């Protein structure tokens, strides 16, 4: 007894778990019933992971579990409902990556308990097929347009006209959802709900139904449905705007701007709870914004709108054909008798193109005629597909097709049961079943191998996409080395520029010295015995060693230098400039020595006083103070740099 009591309490806790978590979110403080209902149902949708399943996956689950062949008023047990929900979540986990797998057992328990609480309040343990379809189609994810198209297919007849009785039944089932989250007083079912949607009793086609349901505003009883879809779209929208009440620096979700107060904007939490401050009042009209535009985009849009460049708004939904597609005529096809425990497997094998044993189709002598009719129907169906692009888009057509297949399968099973078969048929059926089992086993093994290979490739892709710690550690080192190399490059470029500038200054000094020496040699009245009177100054000897500046050519480095130095250094692009400079300095020194000798021989006759300079190897004449003087700067023979020679090595001539 104690164990039974504990199990009952555990079961009751599981049934109330979703509602306890929903109350913890404190949605009841939202003052507007529409937003309060939409937030609660959105919470249930996300908590049950229904937002990951779209309407097409729901339709596939309905067909896999045979709900499309059942009448809407048929009741199913809770155990079968649990099977349907389990197939939905297990198929969902197959589509999701391994890193985003959901807890299937928990999701099944939450959704099953919520559906029982919403649609089986009396505790009968049974739900109608239409209730299950309406609830799952409303609460699943995906586009609202696709949901409404599927819902209309469940409420329309073969001519594509909506049946108001079916619409009333749908509203009765759909409005049980707000009642389940304690919003029945605001959005409970009433007998006049159909008239609020379609006041005029007239023929309602698909396009008119979509226009009404997707209008702004929508019907009052279903106003929470499009709002729930908008909540899903703006959950992650970021607004870099400060809230005027709570002063948060940014907003997520909806943003509300007052139409009367200047630059007064509220986040969704403050607006939903009715907060207001300053001159703003809750009675002011607010505009709901689901995105943020920069001032530049606003200005561009305003200019485009004023110039008429803004395109017209697209319609809320495409226009669908008024007449529904006619279902396929399968009267000439007699499908094979499905096995009791292999129905789903055989359907999957036939759809995947795997050849199945054809001997099971030979139930009589008219088998060639049946195959001929089947091929003719397939050919006509292919021709129809080539001319119609929306054949496969109609859920009603597929439902009728499955219903027709099931009816012929049942008739074939009844005929086969009444037939008396010879003993050879039993052995043949046994062989056919054995072949089927072998084929199924082979396909299951192959499917298992394919799933393992997919899992392995997925793990390799995830490992390759994630950065390893070694790469993360190498990146700072590489950045530091790159920074040092750039710094070293800048230093070398600065050093090279300084050397080029020093070299140019030295060339300018040499040019001035050579001009001065040439002028002195030309103006001298006496000549040396070893030098003729009209002989010009000897040019420096060119060096044969190769070498050039890496970034500047010879003409660039000698810019601003006179013709004599350029003539001495311009030729020979591959030589050592340092050695050339030393050779040029030696030649100038020799020329100076010759000039001093000539001056000494000439001045000895004019001036009797001669003084000897300790810095000069030859006696130098003492020139009067009024004589012009010049200074020549020579590079030292012991240095190997291109910088100017210090004053201690300078020779002065008077």
Curated annotation (Swiss-Prot):
Residues found modified as Phosphothreonine: 11, 69, 179, 212, 424
Name of protein: Dystrobrevin beta
Region listing for Syntrophin-binding region, in residue ranges: 399-448
Biological process annotations from GO: neuron differentiation; synaptic signaling
Region forming the signal peptide: none
Family: Belongs to the dystrophin family. Dystrobrevin subfamily.
SUPFAM superfamilies from the UniProt entry: EF-hand (SSF47473), RING/U-box (SSF57850)
Known function: Scaffolding protein that assembles DMD and SNTA1 molecules to the basal membrane of kidney cells and liver sinusoids. May function as a repressor of the SYN1 promoter through the binding of repressor element-1 (RE-1), in turn regulates SYN1 expression and may be involved in cell proliferation regulation during the early phase of neural differentiation. May be required for proper maturation and function of a subset of inhibitory synapses.
UniProt binding sites for Zn(2+) 2: 258, 261, 280, 284
Lineage, opening ranks: Eukaryota, Metazoa, Chordata, Craniata, Vertebrata
Organism: Rattus norvegicus
Compositional bias ranges of the Polar residues kind: 521-530, 542-558
Transmembrane region(s): none
């Amino acid at each position: 007894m104690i164990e039974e009591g504990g199990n009952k309490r555990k079961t009751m806790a599981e049934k109330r778990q979703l509602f306890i978590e929903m109350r913890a979110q404190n949605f009841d403080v939202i003052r507007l019933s529409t937003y309060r209902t939409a937030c609660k149902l959105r919470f249930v949708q996300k908590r049950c992971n229904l937002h990951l399943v779209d309407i097409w996956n729901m339709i596939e689950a309905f067909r896999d579990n045979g709900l499309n062949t059942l009448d809407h008023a048929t009741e199913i047990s809770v155990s079968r409902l649990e099977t349907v929900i389990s197939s939905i979540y297990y198929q969902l986990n197959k589509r999701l990556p391994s890193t985003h797998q959901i807890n299937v057992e928990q999701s099944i328990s939450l959704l099953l308990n919520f559906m029982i609480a919403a649609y089986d309040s009396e505790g009968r343990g049974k739900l109608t097929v239409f209730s299950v379809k309406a609830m799952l189609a409303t609460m699943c994810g995906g586009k609202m347009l696709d949901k409404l198209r599927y819902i209309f297919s469940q409420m329309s007849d073969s001519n594509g006209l909506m049946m108001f009785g079916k619409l009333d039944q749908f509203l009765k089932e759909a409005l049980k959802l707000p009642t389940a989250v304690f919003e029945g007083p605001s959005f409970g079912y009433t007998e006049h709900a159909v008239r609020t949607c379609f006041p005029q009793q007239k023929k309602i086609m698909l396009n008119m139904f979509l226009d009404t349901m997707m209008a702004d505003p929508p019907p009052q009883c279903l106003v929470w449905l499009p709002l729930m879809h908008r909540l899903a779209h703006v959950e992650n929208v970021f607004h870099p705007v400060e809230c005027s009440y709570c002063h948060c620096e940014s907003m997520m979700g909806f943003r509300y701007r007052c139409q009367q107060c200047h630059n007064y904007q509220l986040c969704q939490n403050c607006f939903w709870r009715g907060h207001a401050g300053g001159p703003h009042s809750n009675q002011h009209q607010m505009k709901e914004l689901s995105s943020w535009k920069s001032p530049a985009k606003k200005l561009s849009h305003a200019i485009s709108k004023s110039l008429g460049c803004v395109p017209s708004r697209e319609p809320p939904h495409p226009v669908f054909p008024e007449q529904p597609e006619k279902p396929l005529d399968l009267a000439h096809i007699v499908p094979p008798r499905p096995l009791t425990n292999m129905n789903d497997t055989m359907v999957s094998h036939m759809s995947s193109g795997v050849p199945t044993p054809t001997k099971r189709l030979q139930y009589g002598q008219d088998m060639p005629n049946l195959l001929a009719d089947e091929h003719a129907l397939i050919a006509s169906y292919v021709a129809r597909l080539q001319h119609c692009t929306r054949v496969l888009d109609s859920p009603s057509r597929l439902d009728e097709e499955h219903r027709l297949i099931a009816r012929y399968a049942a008739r074939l099973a009844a005929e086969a049961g009444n037939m008396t078969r010879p003993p050879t048929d039993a052995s043949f059926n046994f062989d056919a079943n054995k072949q089927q089992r072998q084929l199924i086993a082979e396909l299951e093994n192959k499917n298992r191998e394919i799933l393992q290979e997919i899992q392995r490739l997925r793990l390799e892709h995830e490992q390759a996409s994630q950065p390893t710690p070694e790469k993360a550690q190498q990146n700072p080192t590489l950045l530091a080395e790159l920074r040092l190399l750039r710094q070293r490059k800048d230093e070398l470029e600065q050093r090279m520029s300084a050397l080029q500038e020093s070299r140019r200054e030295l060339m300018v000094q040499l040019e001035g010295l050579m001009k001065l020496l040439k002028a002195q040699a030309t103006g001298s009245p006496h000549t040396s015995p070893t030098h003729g009177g009209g002989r010009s100054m000897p040019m420096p000897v060119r060096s044969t060693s190769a070498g050039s500046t890496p970034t500047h050519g010879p003409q660039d480095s000698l810019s601003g230098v006179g013709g004599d130095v350029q003539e001495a250094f311009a030729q020979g692009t591959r030589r050592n400039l340092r050695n050339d400079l030393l050779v040029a300095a030696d030649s100038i020194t020799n020329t100076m020595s010759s000039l001093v000798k000539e001056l000494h021989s000439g001045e000895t006759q004019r001036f009797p006083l001669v003084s000897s300079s300790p810095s000069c190897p030859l006696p130098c004449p003492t020139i009067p103070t009024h004589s012009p003087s010049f200074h020549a700067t020579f590079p030292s023979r012991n240095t190997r740099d291109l910088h100017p020679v210090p004053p201690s090595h300078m020779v002065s001539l008077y």
